Amino acid sequence: KVDLSLNIQADDNDEPFSLNALERYMLQAKLLDDAIGQGLTEPDIELIKRLKASGTLPMQPFDDLLLRQYQHDIKPLIGRTLFLKGEQASSHADIKLVFDLPITAGKSQQVLLQGRIDDISPKGLVNYRPGSAHGRDVLRLYLRHLCLMAMGHTHASYLLDMGHFHALAPITAERAHVLLADLLVLFYQGQQHPLCFMPRTSLAYVSCEGEHDERLQQALPEWLDEQSQLGEAAFGEGNEPHYQRLFSFPRDFSEDSFGALAERIYRPMVSLYLKDTLAQLEEFALNDGMSQGPANEHATDTQALAPHLNRNSAQGEQA
C-alpha cells in the first residue's frame, strides 16, 4: 500500500533558492554602490566573486541566475545615475546654518545646524536607492535639498529608484531658510509630545484632492499596505509598532491634527516636486527641466510651480 498523503516539509537547514526582501535590498545596494562608485555600468567581477564566496547567496547554479537577474534589474538605474553624475567627480557641501527658533513661549533659542552632504554633481544632488522610493525617502531628499538651497546652491536635487526619478526644483536661500526653521520647530515639538505624522501616509494625503475624509481614504493604502509589493509581511506604516501604540486610524487622523501637519510639512515640498519614469530623465535633465526663478521664491501651494508638478500626481506615492 502506498500512502500518497505524506506531508513532506522542507528542513530548516535546506539551502534557499531565493532571497527575502531585506536580503534582496542589501544585495542590490551593494551592486549599485560598487558600479556607480567606480563609474561602471555593471558591478566589478571581483565583487561578484566575493558575494559568491560569502555564503549569503543560494547554492549553484541559482547564485548565478540570481545575480544575473539583479544586475539586469538595476542596469537602467545605474545608467541614469551615471548620466546625472557626469564625468566629473562628485563633491560635498559643508552645511552650517544658524536659526533663532521660538522653541519656548515668549523666548527664542539659537540653534546651529551643521553637517555634510555628499553626492553633489554639476547637475545637483544625486541620490539613488534600490526598490521604490516612498514618503520617507522623498522627505529625506527634501531636507537635504533645503540645506543646500539655504547654503546658496542653485541646482535641482534628484532621487532615483528602480523605476522612477524624483526631482525637487531649486528655491532661494531665504525661502529655504524659512522652511527649514519651521521644520526644526516641529522637530523640537516632537521631542515634547508625539506628532501625528507618518511620511508615506501624509504624502499620499497631501497628493490627493477633495474633502478630508476622501483624501484620508485615498491615503489609507499607505497606512495598511496589506498587498505589499514585496509579497511578504505587510509593510504599511500602520504595522509599525510605535505608530500602533500611539495612533488609531481613523480616530486620531483628524483634519486639525493629522491633516494640518501633513499640509504644513509637505505642501511646500509638493510645489517643488516632480516624479516621472527613468526613461524620461535624460530628456528632462538635458532640457534644464528645473531652474530657479521668481515663480518659486515664495511657493506655498501646488499652483505656484505648475510646470514642475508631479506628472504622476494622481498616483501619489503608491507607484
Regions found by a protein language model. Give the residues of each.
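Structural signature of nuclease core domains in nucleic-acid processing machines
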Residues: 1-319
